[in-house]
């Protein structure tokens, strides 16, 4: 028989006050039909692929570290559109609107041929190959070998108006009662800004190798003293404003090429007879006899060295245009603060140049016998970039709800727009001394006007100034022509301002044969 019972679960009531809703930029930004093209110069960098090279005193950096496994973070500075001398002033009303840039197209061009680079360590911590083992070998006091390998293959770029957020695993602070020398420390996930020069994951994970691998021999030279970061796509995709990542493209591949085992004392022993008076005896292994090589069990610290495998031009993310129609977040390509961040990783052009120099006096033609000690070997890595943009001019209405959201997102934007700024009445005349630094005149002012602080001053980026590299002539540039042709657009001039409109293609009339 059915019996009615009162509800035993919790009842959820709506909040008494409305919850703040973040609007998409498409809801309040008005896009115009005015487009600009911007492109950088050929951006080149040269350095050592594994480490920085210093002088003997250590106070001068002679050769910087430039590796194909590093992140390249370009900070593109754009001009303020509100200070443009537009030929057609009817585009916007400065009393009721402000202008901003929107990214509509992007092409990241890369020079240099495809190539595979190798990395390694002259003291790499490996005992032997454990995939095809034909003899049982236990560890000694030093089993390190000179080993090299190719890294995981990765192509990736991330576009936004704020820096890309990365994640890595870091050594955490243990509880007071758990602090014991020689024990494995706790680890925690950290979020940091990906800066120019930060190492990407090459197959050993995203972690701080400087603090978590104190033997300095578990990974290759280029990351043994570094932090390998990986973009935190989950955090950026769930960001309420979506400024760090408008869109991204990613291609990674690897396979395990070699299988090794670590040398050293095992930190976590395999459970055996030492657990609870033999409770775990013979649960994981049966010990070998005293007359066998297996009497002392070997390490179980297995690890692979990965390989990026084939590098091909058929799977390239670069040297091709990308068009932004709809971003993944609420920010649909609006470049707040007139800047754009492009984070790039590409190790498919990872060739390291080997340069040899004759160290003896005399000429090469006088050498009779080759001696390796007469030559000095150097390694160099080069990178070549060029970035092109299609920018759209947009208008923001100065309404209360729009300004409230922008103020909550970034209040410094309203300061740059100088909203409600009324200059104070100027005095009729000012005092100006000619020899202000002489002893006969008063002391000059000690507090010059403060410049606006850069919120990213403590980070390292590849700064590129595009304030004087914008053009309305889209058909004069490769990316501009692609943008016009791919959507069937045509460029017209109205009141001295070039704008884009959708053109119509009419068929050709053919004369009818009688």
Swiss-Prot record:
Gene: L1
Biological process, per Gene Ontology: endocytosis involved in viral entry into host cell; virion attachment to host cell
Region (Disordered), start-end ranges: 127-147
Lineage, highest ranks first: Viruses, Monodnaviria, Shotokuvirae, Cossaviricota, Papovaviricetes
Complexes and interactors: Self-assembles into homopentamers. The capsid has an icosahedral symmetry and consists of 72 capsomers, with each capsomer being a pentamer of L1. Interacts with the minor capsid protein L2; this interaction is necessary for viral genome encapsidation. Interacts with protein E2; this interaction enhances E2-dependent replication and transcription activation.
Sorted UniProt keywords: Capsid protein, Disulfide bond, Host nucleus, Host-virus interaction, Late protein, T=7 icosahedral capsid protein, Viral attachment to host cell, Viral penetration into host cytoplasm, Virion, Virus endocytosis by host, Virus entry into host cell
GO CC entries: host cell nucleus; T=7 icosahedral viral capsid
SUPFAM superfamilies: Group I dsDNA viruses
Protein name from the UniProt record: Major capsid protein L1
Function noted in UniProt: Forms an icosahedral capsid with a T=7 symmetry and a 50 nm diameter. The capsid is composed of 72 pentamers linked to each other by disulfide bonds and associated with L2 proteins. Binds to heparan sulfate proteoglycans on cell surface of basal layer keratinocytes to provide initial virion attachment. This binding mediates a conformational change in the virus capsid that facilitates efficient infection. The virion enters the host cell via endocytosis. During virus trafficking, L1 protein dissociates from the viral DNA and the genomic DNA is released to the host nucleus.
Main location: virion
Pfam families: Late_protein_L1
């Amino acid at each position: 028989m059915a019996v009615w019972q009162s509800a035993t679960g919790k009842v959820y009531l709506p909040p008494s006050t409305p919850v703040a809703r973040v609007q998409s930029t498409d809801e309040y930004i008005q896009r115009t039909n005015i487009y600009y093209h911007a492109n950088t110069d050929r951006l080149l960098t040269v350095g050592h692929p594994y480490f920085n090279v210093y002088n003997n005193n250590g106070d001068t950096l002679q050769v910087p570290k430039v590796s194909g496994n590093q992140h390249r973070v370009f900070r593109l500075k754009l001009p303020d559109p509100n200070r443009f001398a537009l030929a057609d002033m009817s585009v916007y009303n400065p009393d009721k609107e402000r202008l901003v840039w929107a990214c509509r197209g992007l092409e990241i061009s890369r020079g240099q041929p495809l190539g595979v680079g190798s990395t390694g360590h002259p003291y790499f911590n490996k005992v032997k190959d454990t995939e095809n083992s034909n003899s049982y070998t236990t560890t000694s006091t030093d089993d390190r070998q000179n080993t090299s390998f190719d890294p995981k293959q990765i192509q990736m770029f991330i576009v936004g108006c704020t820096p890309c957020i990365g994640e890595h695993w870091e050594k955490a602070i243990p509880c007071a009662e758990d602090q014991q020398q020689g024990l494995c420390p706790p680890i925690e996930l950290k979020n940091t800004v990906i800066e120019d020069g930060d190492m990407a994951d090459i197959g050993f994970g995203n972690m701080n190798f400087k603090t978590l691998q104190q033997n300095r021999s578990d990974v290759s030279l280029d990351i043994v003293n570094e932090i390998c970061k990986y973009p935190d796509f989950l955090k950026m995709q769930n960001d309420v404003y979506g400024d760090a990542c408008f869109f991204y493209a990613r291609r990674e591949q690897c396979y395990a090429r070699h299988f090794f085992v670590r040398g050293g004392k095992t930190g976590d022993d395999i459970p055996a007879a030492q657990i609870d008076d033999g409770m775990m005896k013979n649960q994981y292994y049966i010990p070998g006899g005293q007359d066998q090589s297996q009497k002392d069990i070997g390490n179980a610290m297995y690890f692979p060295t990965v390989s990026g495998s084939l590098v091909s031009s058929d799977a390239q993310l670069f040297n091709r245009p990308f068009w932004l129609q709809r971003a993944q977040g609420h920010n649909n390509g609006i470049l707040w603060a007139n800047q754009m961040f492009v984070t790039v990783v590409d190790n498919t052009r990872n060739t390291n140049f080997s340069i040899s120099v004759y160290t003896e006096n005399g000429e090469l033609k006088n050498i009779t016998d080759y001696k390796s000690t007469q030559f000095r070997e150097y390694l160099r890595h080069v990178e070549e970039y060029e970035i092109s943009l299609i920018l759209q001019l947009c208008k923001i209405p100065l309404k209360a709800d729009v300004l409230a959201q922008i103020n909550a997102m970034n209040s410094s934007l309203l300061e740059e727009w100088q909203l409600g700024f009324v200059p104070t009445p100027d005095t009729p005349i000012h005092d100006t001394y000619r020899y202000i630094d002489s002893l006969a005149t008063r002391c000059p002012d000690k507090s010059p006007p403060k410049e606006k602080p850069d919120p990213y001053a403590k980070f390292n980026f590849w700064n590129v100034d595009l304030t004087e590299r914008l053009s309305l002539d889209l058909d004069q540039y490769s990316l501009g022509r692609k943008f016009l042709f791919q959507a069937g657009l045509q460029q017209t001039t109205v009141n001295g301002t070039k704008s884009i409109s959708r053109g119509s293609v009419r068929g050709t009339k053919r004369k009818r044969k009688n």
